[in-house]
Amino acid sequence: MKTRLEQGLSALHLSPPPSGTLERYCSLLLEQNQMMNLTAITDPDQVVDLHMLDSAALLAVDDFSGKKVIDVGTGAGFPGMVLKVLEPTIELTLLDSLGKRVNWLSELSAQLGAAPVECIHGRAEEQALLEGYRDCYDLAVSRAVADLRILAELCLPFVKVGGRFLAMKSDNCQEEVERAGRAIAKLGGQLRPMAQYQIPGTEITRRVVVVEKIRPTPKGYPRRFSRMKKAPL
């Protein structure tokens, strides 16, 4: 695991964190996964490739140094916690709707020496309406499996004007991106050229949809999630 991580990070032009922090993250994830559902991926090498290195690749897409970042629908902490471990100057918020996961993430950040990390149990469509969260972040990131029109409505309200929303997607997302153009514009965003990368040591190619926030998201967004699903923008 250690060699695979080091080689993968080197291929991404990143230095491994001290004290084997990411290896410890892998081990703690797999240990906790026996007690609660954190990931369907249980092979250690695949955890390295599909969680750790996939998340780390985002550091080549944008400058995260010293930035205020929110990871929406973080799950087991991907990509946010990996980004924080590799770039400790990030001011990180992890948001997830499952309380048990959020409690574990809070413990994990301390175990990895990544604290302080703000871990919030909540729904994005409600959290984005609150003062101190709306229009406050330099970067919103998400690896959540959801249509980009819905992800944009959930994530863009968190981003301040001049900031960016980064959505991690599969390589065949072009149609989805084109379909989301109208929604992104309505929410105050503007599509920028997508980034593309290959996960080191694999044949898997991924894309990152880059959206710049050029004006405030109008009042009334995000809507209730049921409404988003029923009538995407």
Model-derived segments and their meaning:
Residues 1-38:
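N-terminal auxiliary segments of SAM/dcSAM-dependent transferases
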Residues 9, 33, 108-109, 181-184:
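Conserved hydrophobic residues forming the short capping helix/wall of the S-adenosyl-L-methionine
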Residues 31, 35, 47-65:
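Conserved alpha-helix/loop element of class I SAM-dependent methyltransferases that forms part
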Residues 56-152:
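Conserved SAM/SAH cofactor-binding pocket of Class I
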Residues 87, 159-161:
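Helix-to-beta-strand junctions that scaffold the AdoMet/dcAdoMet cofactor pocket
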Residues 101-103, 173, 177:
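Short alpha-helix immediately C-terminal to the canonical SAM-binding loop
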Residues 162-172:
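Conserved beta-strand signature within the Rossmann-like core of class I S-adenosyl-L-methionine
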Residues 178-233:
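SAM/dcSAM-binding transferase cores
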